[in-house]
Amino acid sequence: MCRPALARLLLLQLLLLKLYLGKGAMKECDKDQFQCRNERCIPAVWACDEDNDCSDNSDEADCPKKTCAETDFACDNGHCIPDRWKCDGEEECSDGSDESEAACTKQVCPAEKISCGDLSNKCIPSSWRCDGQKDCESGIDEAGCAPACSPDEFQCSNKTCISINFVCDGYNNCGDGSDEKKCSPLTCSPNEFQCNNSVCIPQLWVCDNQADCEDHSDESIERCGYDAKAFNTCAAHEFQCGNGECILLNWKCDGDEDCKDKSDEQDCPLVTCRPDEFQCGDGTCIHGAKQCDKVHDCPDNSDEAGCVQESACESPSKFQCKSGECIDGGKVCDLHRDCRDWSDEPLKECGINECSLNNGGCSHICKDLKIGYECECPPGYKLLDKKTCGDIDECENPDACSQICINYKGDYKCECYEGYEMDTLSKNCKAVGKSPYLIFTNRHEVRKIDLVKRDYSRIIPMLKNVVALDVEVATNRIYWCDLFYRKIYSAYIDKASDTAEQVILIDSQLNSPEGVAIDWVHKNIYWTDSGNKTISVATADGSRRRTVFNSDLSEPRAIAVDPTRRFMYWSDWGDKAKIEKAGLNGVGRQVLVSDNIEWPNGITLDLLNQRLYWVDSKLHSLSCIDFNGSNREVLISSIDDLSHPFGLAVFEDRVFWTDLENEAIFSANRLSGLDISVLAENLNNPHDIVVFHELKQPKAPDSCELSPQPNGGCEYLCLPAPHISPRSPKFTCACPDNMWLGPDMKKCYKELPTTPATVEVPTTTTSHPAATSTVTVTGSANTTTAVIPRAVSEATTAIPSSHSTTSLLIDSEMTTGNSNLSQHYSNNGQGFDSTVTAAVIGIVIPVVVIGLLCMGGYLIWRNWKRKNTKSMNFDNPVYRKTTEEEDEDEIHIGRTAQIGHVYPARVALSLEDDGLP
């Protein structure tokens, strides 16, 4: 009787155990996931979103009624979207209710916008009217527009407008030659020189070491009495071109024409490539692995010519046999063996629809195949584990949107920053307000091109050799460097053509200024000098200046600043080409790019998207990185469009560059590098280029004016410190070259002050762990970095401070040469005064000596006492038997009066055993 009952009980226990184990083996989802009844895991945010993501609808069961916020629009299916997405021309509601006629009643456009017509609910900025770009679907914004050219302009046959001064000047400024048609024979004025080809140039340009006539007659030896090329002296590591240019010596006979006259590739021996290399059609050598890799590495694209594409069984209409063959998909399960191993005719799989059972385990779409099945996902989703679909975060692609990318389930949304609006046709963000225009150098003049109307005019004429420029939009000023005069100038743009309005800012200690940048927030100007191998800074009026860097620079060229984050960036095309970054006060210098870079010329900053762009004249490329040097990308690699790029600028979704070899200005999409177009041709050594628009220079607080004291309390220069963290210092004080900051870190002295600063001893101090302060010594020969201890207490000296987070900068003249000494302190740290240091040492040393003497006396006494102590152990068997679980007791009898004093079981006479040194 008991055995059957026991058996049934045992069987019941086994069943319960099986159920328990089955339950325990149930798949567990992560904390940020929702577990469906069918054990599927989905993101927790997908629950109760009106979508059946579990496929059993368990994620939509027992959901509370959803109420959209006041700033949201409620879709008819219950979804909530931002109200600004309603009636924007794109359906964000899955049911399209946000773009329905009921929701989109006729909009009333505000005063600063115009309507796209009765059949459209779209409003566009008034500045987009008659800008040459169709922004309304109907094109009504470009209808009935008057001719674009003003009375002082000439309209070319291609409808572009140029300054009337460019007509019949011997140059094809229109691009189609219409400005040089029907021109009477040129007659040069008394202040002009006539070239042998009858072209007139200013007399000022004759014998200036730069050929302006196509036949070089203005620089001939007969006229000038000397060979202009003899005046250019190249360094030992450089090669002098036939026209006097200097290039790196290792660029000679490398297969790439770097000299403008191509003399670096003349009389070169026949190039022989190594066995592991491929020789291009032009003779250059590339690594053999780069041949037929679907990337054009040779300048003539010969590395990709004649390549045989490997056959792959990747087409949906193909089937890959397990034995390796690739057969037509229609031959699968047709009762005929087409694969050697019969893998196209599996008996147990042909004719079976796996999707009929639980949707094949697919979370969304199950596609039955002749053999097996596969899971698919709707648009905006991707397979996570071959069965489960997950949302695609399109915003992970930095090129997904022009500016702002917002990812949501199954799709994404692009938006624009303040000051920009989305063009619904191109999906690009366009600037609102005045038309942007390009300003660029053209050797003897500065010109501008309106990017909307394509107006083309001259700003500054009659210059010698302008190579660098920048603008300050708020004040409408332009700054430029003239390489011939070795000076930096400034003027108001609308008055710059008048030489009387041109102000000389810097006219001394300049050798070869090739880059200039304006800090429009803190009103400073920065420039590079490849001759002096320095980077310098001055106030915008040029009254106060100093050298920021004078070491580890070879050929510094372009420079750009970011006053909002308080950093500067520059390119150096010397022996070790690189792009560097540092704070506007010279702190935190670091290399961003040092590999795969040869001849970096122009650089430019996209402040909105935090990207740095640069062109490489040796690699014929246009590349970009983020502000930390990461996410590097080559946008364009073309020897035709980037023959010798120099200047660079970026705005909206376009990047612009000048090219010395093509003598033109190009433009391309800054995200993809596609849509390359020519904006201006037939130029004369175009170098630098900038975009003039108010959105290019956003407003930001002046760090030096946040202090209660003017100029941050600095006697000379107040330089903004880089913004690294919320606790970063705001600025540092700086002195002119060969002068020192005083103890107060604000005043400047010709010699290091010897009079100590007043010291206030605080009544109480708060102890902190010792810190360190870095001292960087930058000299003409080398760079030394030392570490000095920082004050231990929080307050030791009374040094006036203009701001609680102000970093202090000490500049000094080293006795060994013109070197700069800069000591940077933390936010709340104070500098050591020499008197305070001496006082601290005078107190600490005696205390340490007395402490050591006391410790030595104590150790001698303890050692003597232990030597005069004897131990005896008594073993009582009876006592031990009754206390066998207790530890063994020891009784110590000493010669001293301290009878019965208990010592540790182990008596050590060695000082090392006591843990003492």
Swiss-Prot record:
Extent of the LDL-receptor class B repeats: 476-522, 523-565, 566-609, 610-652, 653-695
Disulfide cross-links: C29-C41, C36-C54, C48-C63, C68-C80, C75-C93, C87-C104, C109-C123, C116-C136, C130-C145, C149-C161, C156-C174, C168-C183, C188-C200, C195-C213, C207-C224, C241-C259, C253-C268, C273-C285, C280-C298, C292-C307, C313-C326, C321-C339, C333-C350, C355-C366, C362-C375, C377-C389, C395-C405, C401-C414, C416-C429
Glycan-carrying positions: N158, N196, N532, N628, N782, N820
Cellular compartments annotated: Cell membrane
Tissue: Mainly in brain.
Listed GO MF terms: calcium ion binding
Transmembrane regions: 839-861
Extracellular compartment residues: 25-838
Official protein name in the record: Low-density lipoprotein receptor-related protein 8
Keyword set, alphabetical order: Calcium, Cell membrane, Disulfide bond, EGF-like domain, Endocytosis, Glycoprotein, Membrane, Metal-binding, Receptor, Repeat, Signal, Transmembrane, Transmembrane helix
Pfam family, one: Ldl_recept_a
Cytoplasmic topology ranges: 862-917
Highest taxon of source: Eukaryota
Subunit relationships: Homooligomer.
InterPro entries given in the database record: 6-blade_b-propeller_TolB-like, EGF-like_Ca-bd_dom, EGF-like_dom, EGF-type_Asp/Asn_hydroxyl_site, EGF_Ca-bd_CS, Growth_fac_rcpt_cys_sf, LDL_receptor-like_sf, LDLR-related
BP term (GO), one: ventral spinal cord development
Binding annotation for Ca(2+): W46, D49, D51, D53, D59, E60
Domain LDL-receptor class A, chain residue ranges per copy: 28-64, 67-105, 108-146, 148-184, 187-225, 272-308, 312-351
Topology of the protein relative to the lipid bilayer: Single-pass type I membrane protein
Classification via Gene3D superfamilies: Laminin (2.10.25.10), Low-density Lipoprotein Receptor (4.10.400.10), TolB, C-terminal domain (2.120.10.30)
